[in-house]
């Protein structure tokens, strides 16, 4: 066997001649500094290949015999468990194999010497090969002592890591470590130390590279590969922990074609990692999980505390280097996606040499499967003559966009090793599972934060505009007589702001003071110094529509309930309260003294408003005009089509359209204060009544002329706090009358055309269209009526069909009473009947009957609260003779509203001592409505039958109601409910 001995050659010989004889070259890179610490040390890879089928039968030289005697541990023990008797070779073959190993060791020492020669150009310091050889000799002795033991490497009393730390030698002030890491592909029952004779596969010679299922053996701890028949071997690694860069041979080597088919195809590549063509510093990770603290576990599942040898079945540990089969931790699958701060290719003492590595032409011609390698960009400062400088160039590794990306998987929990002097800025995307051997598929983005649509508190949503059952919809729980609940019909879950979206210490001052465009701003009242707005995070933008609700108390209390929010937002300031920005402009204007908000604008003409007049923010001119127009009972007519423009300049051109716009804005002579002001007034009025009278002052002493003042007692919880809280709770709890006031339908316009003649058919058609619009409002009013939704849907429809005419005529009498002082019939702001129009409508007697009801309102001085409760009782005043489906719920609801009317009459200050008499008068008025409604229904049914002959139009809503009501009423199925007997 012919082996190549080690010769002590001078440092200045031509090195290029030697690189042609070595299949793989070892490249070293240096930081250029004379002193280096352990964190910046290089890592030497002892990876000498050997295959049993490539041992030539030649005689060895003297120097190779020397090395052969230093490697007695390479001889295989025949008594070792897991080795078959058929695989036992003769001692001669073992000696030949040892000689081949010695030859490989000689090649390795030549490469080390060459690397030292390049480093000596800058640092003038060298290390004798004898020291390196001495360290290798110590390692061989160590393996000799432990090589013939039946146990695995993990059972060694002294770990290899400690031995390496003792036997490590310094190169140029640094530390050189021999590290080889790769998953083991041996049999599961076989030990980790085996000969190439025990392997199940073989590597072909360079002439036949078609068989690429090569496996290599590890003698002791040294994986040996033949440089002549270099395939893609899998090496068994000693469990040595490295702190620098790592070198891993790819795992599925049996399926991968070797790019190193011929020794001439390697251009300054490392011996240790054949498929990678990288230097000692370049990592070739296997497609399994490589973690920063990786170790190798044994095939026998014997784990050490710090170092172990692992089979593919024992790879679920976070700190193990395992086979590509099983791994659940984030992995780094190829040099493309390396997150351990390793360079992509080997550099020589500071240069950034980048080159595209391609497989051998022989491999491509043989049809072997190619290994996907990272494609690196060329750097202009490539090594040309061996003279290098300091390493200061960062290589950017770009993965291939095609299927080659399947071999690279981005590590989920890999961290940048700060100890490495090289920084590879590679963009990483976290993945949960390893994508080894499969094509990469991006995970679809999931919105963590999903948008939930809220329900608006509005009874103007119509499913079917002309369907009674469609407007009512399915029943929901409602009022049971006590009107419990808040302004929100649905429960809105408020999540606490945990502050995880932004650090408190990193908020700039511009994001604290002022409104930030990134989200909704909340105003904080700080004494009388103005407001400070703090931007909300993006997670609260999905609930911005909550601020459109008129009641803010519930929402504010839910926000205030979180202690972390109040403590974090205050920042030492006395935060009294905070209000959403777009809730009420008047409220914020009263809060902020230094705000530059626009002045109030008249809702009628657009001029500058002087205040709230008759319930609407208007100017003084529109206020006076409305008062004179209503009290003077002027019957204005528009010269156009009731669509004149009313602004500051043209507001006096058409008084009819101006009055129409005033009514449309909501102006009313009997308008009361807003609900909020009423609450505050109720609190202030109840507090003096609940306070005990002050004690009489003590008599004044005439001698001294001084007044003795009794010491003021501190208010206790029982005497002062509880009454105030009870008063506030009573004021904030809406009463049934308050709820009925808020849900009262708005004013509806008839759309009367003044250009047409006032004939009976035109007036009746206009009244029918107006009644259809008003019925839609009535149905939606009943839908939100407290307690009405508790009834079955069939009962709701029946009650509305029986009482629609009664409700319309009663509301007409109220509007005539409030707007015209019961002198005219106020059907709509644009349709008011005087005596002349009553005669023209062909229903003069019926109009007089409705006018009499309006006059009764004047006599009784009916209040709005009484009117709303009486209106509900009229809704519940006519039922079928057979009864309703839920008669008990109907009786309970009607009884509750009768009690509410009794309470309202008792609270009236003008009826002290005469409450029962007034209650009797109001109930008699309700009974009188039945006689009037019977006459109105008879006239309506007649015009409905003769609508084509009379040319009277009926809207779709009235057609539906009358068609269902007409046969029931004419058959006598309707039963009116009276309070008093006739």
Swiss-Prot record:
Aldosterone binds at residues 768, 774, 815, 943. It comes from the Eukaryota. Expressed in hippocampus, being restricted to the more superficial cortical layers. The keyword Transferase does not apply. SUPFAM superfamilies: Glucocorticoid receptor-like (DNA-binding domain), Nuclear receptor ligand-binding domain. GO terms for cellular component: cytoplasm; nucleoplasm. Residues 724-962 form the NR LBD domain. Phosphorylated. Residues 230-328, 345-375, 682-708 are annotated as: Disordered. A zinc finger (NR C4-type) spans 602-622, 638-662. Residues 258-299, 345-354 have a biased composition (Low complexity). The modification Phosphoserine is found at residues 249, 258, 282, 286, 298. Zn(2+) 2 binds at residues 638, 644, 654, 657. This is Mineralocorticoid receptor. The keyword Phosphoprotein applies. Residues 780-783 are annotated as: Important for coactivator binding. InterPro entries: NHR-like_dom_sf, Nucl_hrmn_rcpt_lig-bd, Nuclear_hormone_rcpt_NR3, Nuclear_hrmn_rcpt, Znf_hrmn_rcpt, Znf_NHR/GATA. It is found in: Cytoplasm; Nucleus. Residues 690-701 have a biased composition (Pro residues). 21-hydroxyprogesterone binds at residues 768, 774, 815, 943. It comes from Saimiri sciureus. Belongs to the nuclear hormone receptor family. NR3 subfamily. Residues 1-601 are annotated as: Modulating.
